[in-house]
Structure formats: structure tokens, C-alpha cells
Amino acid sequence: FTVGSTPDGPGNTQNVGLVVTIGSPVSNAFTARLVQRTLSTCTSASPARISFRSGTQTTGDYAIVTATENVGLTGSVGSTFGFTSAEKGRIYFYAINANPGAANSVIELAIARKAIFDESQLYSTTAEGGAGAADSDTVLYSTSARANVPVRCIGFMDITTGATAGNWSN
């Protein structure tokens, strides 16, 4: 799917797409990637832009952050995100401003089972870790743990888990 508009204010995005690949980088894992609307990797010539709220809770400002390279996150084998075996459900994908307020702000991806993260608030994330231990349905997981970062929900994936919880085979 793609989301597109001109990022001229809070809440807007431009040239944003999301690709989820099951069985990547290994069998029973999945990888989500922030991409251009054309589903190509973001580049400096054709970046994705996302508007985030300020990284300061008491400030109403916003910042437009640009992704100019591959931005991805892997759901590792064994990480259940709160799912049990053979369960239907949804996984939400969030963009986070990993370095709010800095000149070199960076977009990273985060995932959660529940859409409980209000975009007007700041959140701390937990590292997914790659060891199959991301098992809570109410935690926002990212590649690296982050503290007090703005988030934007950029999509979701409907899934049915396999016979073993944490094996992302379908």
C-alpha cells in the first residue's frame, strides 16, 4: 500500500510505502521496509517524508523527517508479539523519529500488535533483539530501544499465525 500527500503540516506524509516480506531474511521471520510509493528503496533523489510531532512533550511544533535509504525492521523467529498459535490478527507498523530535535533526525520502523499508540504522545520502544523474545502485545518494538520518541502509524498487516506461535510463515 502507499500513502501520499504533501508534508506541509503536522500529520502529513509524502512518497511513503510499506513492503512486508514473509520468510525474510530467514524462514519463519518477516521483514518490513519503508519504501517509496513506487515500492523502490528510498533515495536522496526520491525520499520518503513523514511529519512527526515535536520530540518535546510540551511543544506543539512538528518536524518533517526524510528517509533517503533502506529503512527496515525484522520480526524474528520466535517473537510472538502476543499472538498464540493459529490465531488471526493484525500487526501495526509505525514510523518513529529516532532522533527528535536533532539536525540529523532518522526514521526507523517499529511494530506492535495493538494500535494503542497515540501520535500526539511520545513513547519509548523496546529492541526487538533478533532472538525471538518480542512477546508482548502492548509493547512497541524497534531495532534499537528508543526513549521518548514521536510515532506515526503507517500501516498494518492482517495475519494468521502458523501452528507454532512466533513462526511467521504465512
Feature-to-residue mapping (PLM):
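Polar, enzyme-active/binding microenvironments
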Residues: 1-170
